[in-house]
Amino acid sequence: MSVPVAPKKSCYTQLRDNRNAARNNNESILSLGDTNANQIMLEVSSSHDESKTCDLGDEIGNTNSSEPENRTHFHKEFHQLQGFGKGSQAGSASLKDFRLSSTIQRELNEEHTVERGTDSLQTTRSIQGPSLSSWRNVMSEASLDVLAKRDAEIPRHVPKDKLAKTLDNEELRRHSLERASSSVAAVGSLTPQHPQPLSLDSREARGQIPGGGEGPQKTLPDHAVPAAFPATDSTSEGKSVRHPKPSTSESKQSTPSETQTVGAHVLQVCSEHTSHSAHPEPALNLTLASKEIPSKLEAQLGQGKGEAKLDLKYVPPRRVEQEGKAAQEGYLGCHKEENLSALEGRDPCGEAHPEATDALGHLLNSDLHHLGVGRGNCEEKRGVNPGEQDSLHTTPKQGSASLGGADNQPTGKISPCAGEKLGERTSSSFSPGDSHVAFIPNNLTDSKPLDVIEEERRLGSGNKDSVMVLVFNPSVGENKTEVPEPLDPQSGRSEARESKEVTTSVAENRNLLENADKIESTSARADSVLNIPAPLHPETTVNMTYQPTTPSSSFQDVSVFGMDAGSPLVVPPPTDSARLLNTSPKVPDKNTCPSGIPKPVFTHSKDTPSSQEGMENYQVEKTEERTETKPIIMPKPKHVRPKIITYIRRNPQALGQVDASLVPVGLPYAPPTCTMPLPHEEKAAGGDLKPSANLYEKFKPDLQKPRVFSSGLMVSGIKPPGHPFSQMSEKFLQEVTDHPGKEEFCSPPYAHYEVPPTFYRSAMLLKPQLGLGAMSRLPSAKSRILIASQRSSASAIHPPGPITTATSLYSSDPSADLKKASSSNAAKSNLPKSGLRPPGYSRLPAAKLAAFGFVRSSSVSSVSSTQSGDSAQPEQGRPATRSTFGNEEQPVLKASLPSKDTPKGAGRVAPPASSSVTAPRRSLLPAPKSTSTPAGTKKDAQKDQDTNKPAVSSPKRVAASTTKLHSPGYPKQRTAAARNGFPPKPDPQAREAERQLVLRLKERCEQQTRQLGVAQGELKRAICGFDALAVATQHFFRKNESALVKEKELSIELANIRDEVAFHTAKCEKLQKEKEELERRFEDEVKRLGWQQQAELQELEERLQLQFEAEMARLQEEHGDQLLSIRCQHQEQVEDLTASHDAALLEMENNHTVAITILQDDHDHKVQELMSTHELEKKELEENFEKLRLSLQDQVDTLTFQSQSLRDRARRFEEALRKNTEEQLEIALAPYQHLEEDMKSLKQVLEMKNQQIHEQEKKILELEKLAEKNIILEEKIQVLQQQNEDLKARIDQNTVVTRQLSEENANLQEYVEKETQEKKRLSRTNEELLWKLQTGDPTSPIKLSPTSPVYRGSSSGPSSPARVSTTPR
């Protein structure tokens, strides 16, 4: 598609600088409003902004390090998606690190941002060519994938149901990853846009991102972003479909760790999405991109890097908002120029930075931030995961939002860090979506004091991001002039709305924290998705493209976009208002009413649940969209199963999630059909993008069939396939037809009907998606109400194009359709939407329906809540809305509801009508439900409704109870009165007959009176609804006109861009030709010079050869002469040397002879002297020897004589001594003669004693040895005893552990068995639903009992898409 632009370190540096600058600008300002709309600057967010900015700085630093990781995922895909992906990856990695470094909340926000940023970047890449179309498709698909992935990851601590749903979501994710790769990219961008403090907002942002992705893809000129912002909300609702994250919501609520996982997973998902979008989505994106890419590719390639840098350049939200306003006013011209300038400046990194400071510079920053921030966002997302945990723990709802709204997480984190993070994130990667979010928050801030402020802070961060997005969008506008901006506004708006919604939900639904968390995260995500629609103005054109594909969905989106286009940045505040109007508490209606119609900011507590649910629904729709987009996944039961998960039933908001899961089941929403089917078509076509018309025709049956145009859908203003598209839609259709590449725009139908996905989701949820079982299971009355309110908000989003549709939808609203058979389609759609059992399920026993969560009374409430969902978008107002629409008994509620409806109507045109119709619908629904639904089911539904809104009794239940009480009770009283009144005098028979007649007449009168009262009440409600519808229609018409004007401007700008591209292309071709000519000349000259050189070389060689030969001869002669002379000289020298040598030899010989003679003489003389001296000495020695011998002989003789004499004397002396001693001995020994015997006896005794002693010693030794052995043995015994004790203790411990493990094993086996049974049941339900969907006649209404309000509505009402959609069930 486009050449991937590798993010530069300088880009990261720029991003860091931009973020710091953004923090400086954003520290004091947390813009909560659209740039065009009231800018609600939350100073409170300043800390968050600072934190965010700092974190962004860190993030950027980290991005450099982490960038490889994200870039690894995204780079592969980003190569296809374009250079933006890389920046996105790097940014996301950096953001991730930054997120880690920042506070956990800030991390949550960053995670959202990272996810959104990466997706956005990816989307931007994919969409660079077909900026709007590509953006939208990429964004929608990316968001879908991201959501799917996020869903897959989010179910961290999710119950089995949640896990099952998560698994299905993951499957959807896998399918949609391929489809929504581009969408993920878009989502990534949007995600950075919506990393608002509120994690829910983040999720909304994410949810919105798909829509935003569509929106940005469709973003015509960046200036359209203002309108797109409101549209973003619409898209965000549509994107909420993407909320196949019901499990994600619950997962969020389940655990921050889940959130973390989700965040990381989302990054991966973004990568996968990016790759998918790069590959599968390229079919759409490439088609769109292929057309626009040629022109934009060059600019984007040049600018892609610049854009990455722009991403690095973070523009302060306030600046971005302020400049965004200015830019929106001068968006077309200035934005582009600034984009270019910013891009150019950003390429140098230093130049763009100052420009980023400028409004357009900021816009460029926003756009680039989309890309660069995308990287940062990915990082942020990773980092956010930990942050998300804190966010989840700190703010359960926000935590949820952080999961779902990793993109919007900064909002969830609006804590002290949230402000900083908002600023940073806004600066970094939230600029696209956040810019709008900031705008939306203004209205929200006005409407909501606390929650709204909190939400606004989140939105404010989102707005900052949105502003940044605006800045970024311009740069993208250059590269993807149309894509980034729309993404930004839409994302911002939907995020803002979702933030509001989340805030309200947080404040109001603290008790619903789990559900709210899930739903809010889903809503946040939806908002994220919706935020993406913020660029609906740009998207408006794109929406048109989508519209052809999914007329209803497209139309709704188109209307929304038209409204958005009509109301630029100003629209976002209206969007907030519209959200508020869409039962302003119903924050999801932010997207629903992206139109410039200001909606009163009602408490969003109610709105939050609805919006959350709506967001979830959108996300679900998105999931479905993804499912459809990928391999026509919507029919896949896997997706349905996860959606069917019963846990959703527990959570009203989970309903939306379940809807998301349901959507993939193959209940093609109009949006999914448009968004995903188109991608599927394109994918199926093998990357060939068919014209939107072809796609529309192709998917028309799906749109008509699976697309259950529930009352919510109708209310949302989504035109059924039959409904004509709004002007903008038509234009988009034309564009789509003209530009198959724009089918991407179509592929995200939500973009057209941001809310419709929610409506479809609700309708589908209630009707076919989960098969009623899962749907009713998932949505309690409260959930259904939320769904209805979300639908209504979605319808509010859709009003621009689908005002007519809205009218038909409203006429088909449960009140009108259910009451009046004429609105059969609406009744059908309302039934599923309101939670009524689908026609097929109406036959199911009440117990079964109740088990599924489909209670007649509840569904009636849901139907009315579809409209009342608009007015009762706040969870509070859900029951009230039902009673208001369905029951005139609650005048106060009615009054509030009409006002809500009026805002709704204003926002979505259809909602007012739906509200008026809703009352009749409710009144009708209660009776039919009571008739068709067992009391138990009704009671369950009523209980759900009562639980949600005990004050407001469901109209059906009230009507049924009233009717039942009066019919049986009053008639009896009247009979008694008749008896008393008639005198007993007449004949008893006559009296009896008269009494009976009177009683019958009275009963008939009572019935007629009641009917008349009901009809009057319905008439009043219908009048109010039509008034609201008229106001909304006018509003949307005006908005549509403004959108058309903007569309024209955008088309002009696009034409200019194309002209420029063509000019540059021609110039490039010319230069190429010149280059080729010069190359040819050069080659010829080189050849000529080569030949010339060769000739010269040969000539030179010959000349040198001759010279060499001559020189050789001369040198040889000289050498010969020299040799001769040298030889002569040598000979002479030899002769001389020989003569001198001979003379020397003779002289030496003579000298030698003389010397020898002298030496011989000396030797002889010395020998003679030595001989004479020797002889003399010998003689002397002989003489001396003789003398000595003689003297010694004399001495020897003398001594011999003396020794003999001495021997004789000694012998004599010895003899004398011996004799003497013998005598003495005899005398002395006489007394001792017996001593010897005594000695012998003593010796014997001693020997005996010695033997005894030896024996004793031996025994002692043996005993000592034994003692030693005993000591050793005792020690060994002690050791063995200790060992034995240790072993016993271990045995005891092992026994305990074994018991515990066995118990755990048993429990696990039971759990597995239960899980298996549940899976089987869900599979059966899924198969049943799939069978019903497959076998259901798309054109014929379901055969309901003639008394069934749905049946009557469908039979009497004109064949509307709603009826068609109802039939698929």
UniProtKB/Swiss-Prot annotation:
Residues 180-262, 374-442, 477-509, 582-627, 791-839, 861-992, 1331-1369 are annotated as: Disordered. Residues 801-1150 are annotated as: Localization to the growing distal tip of microtubules. Residues 801-890 are annotated as: Sufficient for interaction with KIF2C. Residues 246-262, 392-401, 804-814 have a biased composition (Polar residues). Residues 641-980 are annotated as: Mediates interaction with MAPRE1. It is found in: Cytoplasm, Cytoskeleton. Detected in embryonic stem cells differentiating to cardiomyocytes. Its main location: cytoplasm. Residues 937-947 have a biased composition (Basic and acidic residues). Residues 821-834, 1348-1369 have a biased composition (Low complexity). Binds microtubules. Together with MAPRE1 may target the microtubule depolymerase KIF2C to the plus-end of microtubules. May regulate the dynamics of microtubules at their growing distal tip. PANTHER family: MICROTUBULE-ASSOCIATED TUMOR SUPPRESSOR CANDIDATE 2 (PTHR24200:SF14), TOUCAN, ISOFORM A (PTHR24200). This is Microtubule-associated tumor suppressor candidate 2. The lineage of its organism: Eukaryota, Metazoa, Chordata, Craniata, Vertebrata.
